[in-house]
């Protein structure tokens, strides 16, 4: 997915056979603040660019009263993403599904896109599997190397 204004735009999807039904598909746009891909991309941007994208409360989209609703809440969430090294979303886009995402960066360290994994997770307090995180981080690192022209 890539950032397109305040939304993420899905440009490539690879689905597991028998996997959960996803609302994301090539060409679909979703609010960046509700998705792991969007949060990963926003966390990799300079703070002033994030402020320009989300200048006030009217810039935020919530789903069923959930999701960030202010610049303060968004900055806090993006700081958590940076500290953790990946973005996570539990049930904001689709109930019962969780996602993690990591940005792909260009030679200037600017985020170009994000790679993510989504899985069915009905737990009250979903746990993110370290092996899944590692796989997504390795995929993003490899794509970053390729974008930067390194083998």
Locations of regions flagged by a protein language model:
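Sensor-regulatory modules in signal-transduction proteins
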Residues: 104-107
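Glycine-rich beta-alpha junction loops
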Residues: 6, 15, 58, 95, ...
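Juxtadomain coupling helices with adjacent low-complexity linkers
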Residues: 72, 77-79, 84, 95, ...
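Short hydrophobic beta-strand micro-motif common in sensory/regulatory domains
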Residues: 98-102
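Short, solvent-exposed recognition segments
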Residues: 12-93
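Short hydrophobic alpha-helical segments used for membrane anchoring or interfacial signaling
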Residues: 1-5, 11-14
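A conserved hydrophobic position in a structured secondary element of the catalytic/binding core
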Residues: 3, 45, 119
